[in-house]
């Protein structure tokens, strides 16, 4: 069985953003997400966030958020649209993601 488990962004040498880092910068991260059309931001697991991507946004907007979030946190961040949650074989951490 395969899981939906990787974002469409090039790999980096940064460590994945841990929960403490994401929560410590949560207010800034939520504001950054809103600027990029992402709401209801949630922490899934190290380096993995889930959010509601606005209908008028696309994969390039998501990638722009990931790049900006990496710069803010100094750590790897991948964003998964909450639209994937209804798909088969979704990784359990995405389903169990908790609000930032």
Q: What residue ranges belong to the model's regions?
A:
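Short, aliphatic-rich beta-strand segments
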Residues: 46-53
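Catalytic core of pol beta-like nucleotidyltransferases
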Residues: 1-42, 54-100
């Amino acid at each position: 069985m395969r899981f939906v488990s990787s974002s469409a962004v090039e790999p980096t040498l940064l460590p994945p953003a841990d929960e403490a880092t994401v929560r410590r910068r949560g207010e800034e991260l939520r504001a950054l997400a809103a600027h990029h059309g992402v709401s209801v931001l949630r922490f899934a697991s190290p380096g993995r966030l889930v959010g509601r991507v606005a209908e008028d946004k696309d994969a390039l907007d998501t990638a722009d958020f990931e790049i900006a979030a990496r710069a803010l946190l100094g750590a790897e961040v991948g964003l998964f649209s909450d639209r994937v949650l209804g798909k088969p074989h979704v990784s359990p951490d995405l389903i169990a993601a908790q609000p930032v």
